[in-house]
From Swiss-Prot:
It comes from the Eukaryota. It comes from Cyanidioschyzon merolae (strain NIES-3377 / 10D). This is Large ribosomal subunit protein bL12c. Keywords: Chloroplast, Plastid, Ribonucleoprotein, Ribosomal protein. Homodimer. Part of the ribosomal stalk of the 50S ribosomal subunit. Forms a multimeric L10(L12)X complex, where L10 forms an elongated spine to which 2 to 4 L12 dimers bind in a sequential fashion. Binds GTP-bound translation factors.
Amino acid sequence: MSTKINSLLEEIKSLTLLEAAELVKQMETTFGIDASAVATAAPAVQVETKKEEKTEFALVLSQVPADKKINVLKVVRTITGLGLKEAKELVDSVPKTLKEGLSASEAEQLKTQLTEAGAQVELK
């Protein structure tokens, strides 16, 4: 910066609040500007939004091929603790939610068991 600008800056720094307000008024009238419009036009602050990571998952049985129904039925009984009749009704009426509120690792483990048995499974 030039010495002229540096000296002006130092002079402005030394002003009291009343003197600075008077300077602003004088600049507004001299240059025909409105300092309040400049003060309110502050740059927009960008807020960084973090995508929430899911902590709870629901295990949904979406499809069971007819030839894999018995294997899937065994796994469903193991996972849910249902009796044979209830598990069969559940498998026959897909899509159905098997479990909710599962952790990510538990949900993935159960999904793997069901897909290995032949079912199509979704995590929601």
